[in-house]
């Protein structure tokens, strides 16, 4: 009688190996392929498209099932940390906008306002942005899932979760089982990240390159420098204020395991499953992160606030419009509000720049030229913006959960 030999060990080693190291290998190979053969690099871009498509496909179902399951099984009296997380989201976004204002005054940038972008229609005012968000809340659930409308998905998931609290245990068990099944699919998709990053890097470098970015080197330095300051100084200060210990191990973990993915996928929605997996790895409260992560992907937009502020003030400096301190502070507030609505606007943060430009009386045709500049530098700007936005979702969720656990431990010692 013959016995079957186990499958080759290299497959299991790949499956169990360090995902971050594999992603770095994929990144290096992607750069090399783009340098050696552009046609081949463009061809393997399909791997990146498939990876991002898979993440985007599973994310809406994941959010619906996790939120519904966590609320349906929530026990009366069981505490979650949603309120402090929401406060951190808003404070972080406003702090990012203020930082961008300071950077823009210390390192003023100017633009070459020659490109037209008449085919793009931005929202006419902040009221329209807020109206769009409200309309997203009352979206048809099937339509919300098909179009990845996370505001609508959250509303339906919360509503169904509360309704199912009074359901049978069999129903709750079924929801939990489906939730675990979707989570398993997400883990499988994430294991293909090295191939996805390889394809994304290869095709991006082969099709766009970085030649067009050199003309906007100073503007990019201000944007990226501001985002780095927020990621490595401002956010750690907020986390330290919350957890009262060295924040950098947590900050660097979130940047490494969430920011790296988001940088290459350039999609907060696609990074929701990655953040969910990171929160599970950090052993955070499932009831909390299943709500806070998709909520953060919708309203926690520090990177968008920076983009709106820096590009608006670049236009202001180009046109020699004087700006006083109260106006700069008001711009920070407007940029923060615009950033929170960026997920509800096609084109994201760039198409909300005309709203901020309107504060300074900048005509719409000039504002749209600023938007066009944003699209030119978008290869790097959008990647950095998404990395900051998405990694901060996981960071603030972890900080609030850790602070809550510490408080519970202190209360237990006192009693």
Curated annotation (Swiss-Prot):
It is found in: Cell inner membrane. One of its GO terms (cellular component) is plasma membrane. It is a multi-pass membrane protein. It catalyses: L-serine(in) + Na(+)(in) = L-serine(out) + Na(+)(out); L-threonine(in) + Na(+)(in) = L-threonine(out) + Na(+)(out). One of its GO terms (molecular function) is neutral L-amino acid:sodium symporter activity. Keywords: Amino-acid transport, Cell inner membrane, Cell membrane, Membrane, Symport, Transmembrane, Transmembrane helix, Transport. One of its GO terms (biological process) is serine transport. Gene3D superfamilies: Sodium:dicarboxylate symporter (1.10.3860.10). The chain crosses the membrane at residues 23-43, 47-67, 85-105, 144-164, 181-201, 220-240, 293-313, 333-353. Its main location: membrane. It comes from the Bacteria. NCBIfam families: PRK13628.1. Belongs to the dicarboxylate/amino acid:cation symporter (DAACS) (TC 2.A.23) family. PANTHER family: PROTON/GLUTAMATE-ASPARTATE SYMPORTER, SERINE_THREONINE TRANSPORTER SSTT. HAMAP family: Ser_Thr_transp_SstT. Involved in the import of serine and threonine into the cell, with the concomitant import of sodium (symport system). This is Serine/threonine transporter SstT. It comes from Klebsiella pneumoniae (strain 342). The lineage of its organism: Bacteria, Pseudomonadati, Pseudomonadota, Gammaproteobacteria, Enterobacterales.
